[in-house]
């Protein structure tokens, strides 16, 4: 139901928007992203994983774009009894922009993300020792907001917050900064 409403909103937006001067066309880019993993089941602090994300997409006009992303984690983080490592991630997204000036474009973004990671926990509960080593896939609808700033006609930078996964007692989000090049 939510997906159908989202697709309808995108179609209406695409049909109502006119072309503009903002580097319409294909682009590629890369971001440094600090992924944040929260797991309420283990009552641990937020785990932070450094990662690199590659982006490629197409800006139809000033207001509408689509992009795909793929990335991988560089390391793992441990706090208390929990350890998390992100192996890889990929997804597809629709981006809606609202230009403030010729070079400043805040946006919202939504789509679907798949990730593979490993969650490890080791501890003791009521005198019983336990150990969890779970390599698993995370997939969910994703959304976020950010700002693109054009530095030149073909080079831009961006800052973004994204919620990639939020189910049950687990959440994966990310704050990123990066560069992109239009061609």
Report residues per predicted region.
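Outer-membrane beta-barrel proteins
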Residues: 16-19, 36, 60-62, 95-102, ...
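Repeated loop/turn-to-beta-strand initiation elements of outer-membrane beta-barrel proteins
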Residues: 26-28, 63-68, 102-106, 149-159
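Short glycine/proline- and aromatic-enriched beta-strand/turn motifs that initiate or cap beta-hairpins
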Residues: 20-74, 96, 114-116
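Residues on the lipid-exposed face of transmembrane beta-strands in outer-membrane beta-barrel proteins
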Residues: 54-58, 92-98, 110, 145-149, ...
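Residues that define the transmembrane beta-barrel architecture of outer-membrane proteins
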Residues: 48-52, 84-90, 137-143, 171-175
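Predominantly the C-terminal beta-signal and adjacent terminal strand-loop region
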Residues: 75-76, 139, 143, 148-183
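Cleavable N-terminal export/targeting peptides
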Residues: 1-25
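Outer-membrane beta-barrel translocator domains and adjoining extracellular loop/strand segments
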Residues: 38-47, 76-84, 118-131, 169-175
